[in-house]
C-alpha cells in the first residue's frame, strides 16, 4: 500500500457506518358518491262534468337537501429511535441514560518519548492529527474516564474545525502560542488553559519536560461551568442492532502521517483493531494493553501551514 499523508480518525464505537432512514408517507384519499332522486310524474285525467268550479290554489313545496362530507385522518409513520451513547453509538439498555456531562477533549503527546500514553483506550473517540514532524492525539471522553490522562500537550488552530461538532467541549491542553491561545479563547470551547486552571495539572513520572504533564478526567470534568448546556449530541449514524455494515473486508491499513508510520491490524480475538507506530506495538500505560479500537476511519486531506 503506497503511503499517503492522511489524517486518521479513530472511533471507539461498537458500530459505525452511514445509515439510510426510509420514511413512508401514506396518503389516504376519501371519495364521495353522489346519488339522485327520481321524481314521480302524474298525468291527470279530466272529464267534463256539471259542477261549480272551485277556485284553484297553488301550494309551493320546498325540499331541503343535507350534504355530509367525511375527511380521512392523516396517517403518520413514526420511525423508532434507538437510544445510544452519543459518541460511541453503543445502544443503551432500557432506563439507562448517557452521562449528563459535556465532551472532554484532551490533547495527548505522541512523541516517542511520550509513549506509552495514558488514556487512549478509555476515550470514546481519538483523533490523530499531523503536527510538526509527527502527530498528536485529541482524545475525546464522555462515557469513560482515565486516571491519569496524558502526557498533555499544546493545541492547534485546526482543533477548532476538527472538534467543532462536539457541542462546546471542555478543552484540556498545555497552552499554545499567543495566536493559538486567542483562537481557542474566542471559540466555543470551554478553555481549560493551565494559566486559568493551574490546579488541574501536574508534572509526574520520570520523563523529561514537556512530556510529563498530566491530569485526570475526573478533575477536568469537575471544571465544567455550571451553566453548560450538557452532553454532546449524536455525532454519527450507526447501523441498527443485528444489521451488518457494508464495504469490503480488509485486515490491515498502513500509512504515513508526516514522520510517523501507522499500522492498524484486525484481530479476530478482540474483534477489533490493534495499533503499531513506527514498527512497534503501541500500548496504553494504564492497562499495559495495546492501543485498540472497534472502528478506524482514515481521512486523506490536505495540510497547509497555519497562520498561527
Regions found by a protein language model. Give the residues of each.
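Hydrophobic multi-pass inner-membrane translocation pores used for secretion
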Residues: 9, 30-31, 46, 71
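Bacterial signal peptide processing site
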Residues: 32-36
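Sec-dependent bacterial lipoprotein signal peptides
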Residues: 1-30
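Extracellular mucin-like PTS domains
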Residues: 41-80
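Short linear motifs in intrinsically disordered/low-complexity regions
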Residues: 3, 38-42, 290, 296
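Generic low-polarity alpha-helical segments
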Residues: 1, 25, 64-66, 297-298
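Residue-level detector of alpha-helical hydrophobic segments embedded in or interacting with membranes
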Residues: 1, 43, 50, 69, ...
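A surface/extracellular/periplasmic glyco- and lipid-processing/surface-interacting theme
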Residues: 77-127, 132-308
Amino acid at each position: 500500500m503506497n503511503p499517503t499523508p492522511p489524517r486518521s480518525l479513530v472511533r471507539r464505537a461498537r458500530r459505525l457506518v452511514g445509515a439510510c432512514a426510509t420514511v413512508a408517507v401514506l396518503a389516504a384519499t376519501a371519495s364521495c358518491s353522489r346519488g339522485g332522486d327520481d321524481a314521480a310524474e302524474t298525468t291527470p285525467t279530466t272529464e267534463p262534468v256539471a259542477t261549480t268550479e272551485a277556485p284553484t290554489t297553488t301550494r309551493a313545496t320546498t325540499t331541503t337537501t343535507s350534504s355530509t362530507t367525511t375527511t380521512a385522518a392523516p396517517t403518520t409513520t413514526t420511525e423508532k429511535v434507538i437510544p445510544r451513547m452519543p459518541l460511541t453509538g453503543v445502544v443503551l439498555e432500557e432506563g439507562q441514560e448517557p452521562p449528563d456531562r459535556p465532551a472532554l477533549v484532551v490533547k495527548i503527546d505522541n512523541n516517542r518519548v511520550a509513549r506509552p500514553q495514558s488514556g487512549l483506550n478509555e476515550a470514546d473517540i481519538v483523533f490523530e492529527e499531523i503536527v510538526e514532524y509527527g502527530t498528536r492525539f485529541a482524545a475525546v471522553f464522555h462515557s469513560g474516564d482515565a486516571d491519569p490522562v496524558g502526557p498533555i500537550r499544546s493545541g492547534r488552530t485546526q482543533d477548532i474545525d476538527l472538534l467543532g461538532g462536539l457541542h462546546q467541549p471542555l478543552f484540556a491542553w498545555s497552552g499554545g502560542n499567543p495566536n493559538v491561545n486567542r483562537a481557542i479563547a474566542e471559540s466555543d470551547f470551554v478553555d481549560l488553559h493551565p494559566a486559568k486552571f493551574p490546579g488541574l495539572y501536574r508534572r509526574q513520572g520520570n520523563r523529561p519536560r514537556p512530556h510529563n504533564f498530566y491530569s485526570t478526567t475526573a478533575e477536568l470534568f469537575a471544571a465544567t461551568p455550571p451553566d453548560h448546556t450538557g452532553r454532546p449530541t449524536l455525532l454519527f449514524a450507526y447501523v441498527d442492532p443485528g444489521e451488518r455494515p457494508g464495504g469490503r473486508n480488509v485486515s490491515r491499513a498502513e500509512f504515513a502521517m508526516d514522520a510517523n508510520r501507522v499500522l492498524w491490524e484486525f484481530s479476530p480475538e478482540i474483534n477489533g483493531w490493534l495499533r503499531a507506530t513506527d514498527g512497534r506495538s503501541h500500548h496504553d500505560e494504564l492497562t499495559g494493553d495495546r492501543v485498540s479500537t472497534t472502528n478506524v476511519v482514515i481521512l486523506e486531506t490536505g495540510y497547509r501551514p497555519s497562520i498561527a
